[in-house]
UniProtKB/Swiss-Prot annotation:
GO annotations of cellular component type: nucleus
Chain positions covered by the region annotation Disordered: 59-90
PROSITE patterns: HOMEOBOX_1, HOMEOBOX_2
Pfam families: Homeodomain
UniProt family annotation: Belongs to the Antp homeobox family. Proboscipedia subfamily.
Protein name: Homeobox protein Hox-A2b
Species of provenance: Takifugu rubripes (Japanese pufferfish)
Role, per record: Sequence-specific transcription factor which is part of a developmental regulatory system that provides cells with specific positional identities on the anterior-posterior axis.
UniProt-listed InterPro entries: HD (IPR001356), HD_metazoa (IPR020479), Homeobox_CS (IPR017970), Homeodomain-like_sf (IPR009057)
Length: 300
């Protein structure tokens, strides 16, 4: 009766004590409750707890249950399979050639579509409005990248041209400066030759002019030489006798431009009028003196 009452009370309370469980399992014949409790306290719990109770006690800790351990081991596989299988990713829309052609035509004329036009194109091409919208967004980004890359290439080409141009200009300037120096040297050489020729010609001309002037002066002096003799009228016969080869001795004294009768002093005229005899040597000395005076006057 006590055993049955204990089991009923255990099921009613639903929280049986450890002593009642040990009593019901160790003494099924029907020992007293006190004796069974004393005996169970003296025994070790490892020898008295059956395997089903160990499983129930172990089951109270969810972390050590094998079912939970298997679920924990399989969860990484599910995480790994998820991204690999691609079930979570959105499927990419596959456009046909006709759809792409029509979309490219529309993008060529209109890069931004209004909603009515987008709905119309989606109905014509058997697409959804969202698909058309996404395609135009992607196409605008692609066009922007292409334009940006093209601008970068053009700018790099321009910078390269600008970098190359100064070198070419420097080379051209260097070549031009060398050619200019060569031309300048050649021109200076030609000018030096021309000036040297002019100097030579000028020297020749001066020498010729000097020689011509000297000849003219000599001729004039030679012309004036015979006119000196008639300064002494009393000695005309001796001059004619000595210098018959000169035809200018017959000229009168008045035609001689240098000497005039008024230029003679009275003493000299008196001396000429006197009948003093003059030798030919004295007369020659006198005529030479007069000719030297005449040459000095002509030179100055």
């Amino acid at each position: 009766m006590n055993y049955e009452f204990g089991r009923e009370s255990g099921f009613i309370n639903s929280q049986p004590s450890l002593a009642e469980c040990l009593t019901s399992l160790s003494n099924p014949v029907g020992d007293a409750f006190q004796s069974s409790s004393i005996k169970s306290s003296a025994l070790s719990p490892s020898t008295l707890i059956p395997p089903p109770f160990e499983q129930t006690v172990i089951g109270l800790n969810p972390g050590t249950h094998p079912r939970h351990s298997r679920s924990k081991q399989s969860s990484p596989e599910a995480i790994d399979v998820g991204p690999g299988g691609g079930t979570s990713r959105r499927l990419r829309t596959a456009y046909t050639n006709t759809q792409l052609l029509e979309l490219e035509k529309e993008f060529h004329f209109n890069k931004y579509l209004c909603r009515p036009r987008r709905v119309e194109i989606a109905a014509l091409l058997d697409l959804t409005e969202k698909q058309v919208k996404v395609w135009f967004q992607n196409r605008r980004m692609k066009h922007k990248r292409q334009t940006h890359c093209k601008e970068n290439r053009d700018s790099e080409g321009k910078y390269a041209c600008l970098d190359d141009e100064p070198e070419d200009e420097f080379e051209q300037e260097a070549g031009g400066s060398v050619a200019a120096t060569l031309l300048e040297r050649e021109r200076q050489f030609q000018q030096n030759q021309f000036t040297s020729q002019q100097c030579l010609n000028g020297n020749n001309g001066e020498s010729q002019s000097l020689s011509a002037a000297l000849l003219n002066s000599n001729e004039k002096n030679l012309k004036h030489f015979p006119n000196v003799a008639p300064t002494v009228p009393n000695c005309a016969s001796t001059i004619e006798a000595d210098n018959r080869h000169s035809p200018g001795l017959d000229l009168p004294l008045q035609d001689f431009p240098v000497f005039s009768p008024s230029s003679f002093s009275p003493s000299f005229s008196d001396s000429t009028e006197s009948s003093l005899p003059l030798s030919s040597e004295t007369f020659d000395l006198f005529s030479e003196t007069l000719t030297t005076i005449d040459l000095q006057n002509l030179s100055y």
